[in-house]
Amino acid sequence: FNSVNYSMTTLASGGFGTSDSGIMAFDSALIESIIMVFMVLTCINYSLYHLFLAGRGKEALKDEELRGYLLIILIAWLAMGFNLVRSGVSDDGFFETMRHAAFQAISISSTGYSSTDFSKWPVFSQFVLLLLMIVGASAGSTGGGLKVLRIRVAFELAKREVLRIIQPKKVIAMRVNEDVIDEDQVFIVLGMISAWLVLSMSSMLFISFLEPQWNMDDVLSVVVSSLGNTGPALGSYGPTSTWSSMSDLTLFWTSILMWFGRLELLTVLVLLHPRTWKDIS
């Protein structure tokens, strides 16, 4: 029963389980390792699986977003692991501490499962988790967040603008996977990131007004977690806590944010725009 439920919630990046403590209830390195493998698989662009099935595995492995995602996870894992070992906040041994760091680095942009209570981790490790919530997984995956590809395009745009200031007469093309990114695609990415920033900032103001007893960690992490479909947040709403203490209006608004995050912001904004329905009618 447990294996069926956790298999389905892992592949769909759902993150809920059969007990309140979730994955922590098993306290098993083997179970966590198996789940980690499948969480990584769900955070990869699903179109790459078609390449593997078509016998084009080498081409799939050269995908820059895939490499970028794996590199981000690797750096986050090592950074948090080093920070946890150095800080001494955990009573776990070295290997167990590194295991928890790896599990959380992967799960925070996927299922949101927790193998330990990371709300007790040092500020640096929690900040890394917050960044992972924002970045998320690959485009075309079941993971959440802004997506690695969009972050990559934004980085390439910033790099191009710096180079254009240095060499104003030079024509500089932006490329991902050797393909030139046209301006329309760049504007879509910028529109998505801008919409995310506006919605997140306004939501933080709104929720901080609704919940005056919250601190900055609570407000920031709850909004980011909701938009990224992460599940747990930081602070008072970490992996061992529930959101039942929130006001009805806060729960309603965070549910709206989860809906926005799951369906993609621009898609929902287009759907809600009156002109869309006017053209249909």
Describe each region flagged by the PLM.
Residues 1-281:
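Membrane-proximal intracellular helices of multi-pass ion channels
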